[in-house]
Amino acid sequence: QGIKRTFPRRKKAMIFAAGLGTRLKPLTDTRPKALVEIAGKPLIEHVLQKLVSAGFNDIVVNVHHFADMIEEWGRNIVETPYYKDKNIRISFSDERHELLETGGGILHAAALLTNNNPEHKFLVHNVDILSNLNLDEFWTKSHGSADAVLVVSKRKTARYLIFDDEMNLVGWTNISTGEIKSPYEEVHEQLSQRPQDALDFRNYHLRAFSGIHLI
């Protein structure tokens, strides 16, 4: 009698790979940003390897710009021995008709990510983010702690997420234009008085989104 192989339960993640890659032109004139190579491998392969090493085995990739090229890459990579042995599955969320951005992209892929179970958590990772973050530790510590958990950093940029002292998300700001978006009037009042270079002011903290989050 043969031995039946068993695989771990499906652990889902989404790679955002639909972007136009305008900041990487002219490289993205002939290929999607996801397939631009860094250190001898496409960006998307770096992200995939990091996800798989953290135990993610069911990957959804959204596609728009040069979508056919990404789909062909995905079909080929899962047939290589490393990924085939780990029973890695890659499916695609088709945005050829319209680039749906972050919220729209997640909503469009929801059925693939949750199997119509709203309690099913998943990780979202931008294709152009390379980091040393331990994704398995992030998943374990953050799972069930909130409706969404975002990886942020304290660095200089133009657009920031606004957090309160307990690191709850309370708004967004573009410091180059002065625009503030928040449902809380106090956030508008306090941050309108913020010194230009202050990322921590009174009860609020400005942090840059790092392109990785758990939903």
Where are these regions (language model features)?
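Conserved core of the sugar-phosphate nucleotidyltransferase
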Residues: 130-215
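Conserved N-terminal catalytic core of the sugar/cofactor nucleotidyltransferase
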Residues: 2-15, 23, 37, 41-126, ...
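Short alpha-helical oligomerization interface
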Residues: 29-33
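Conserved SAM/SAH-binding loop
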Residues: 20
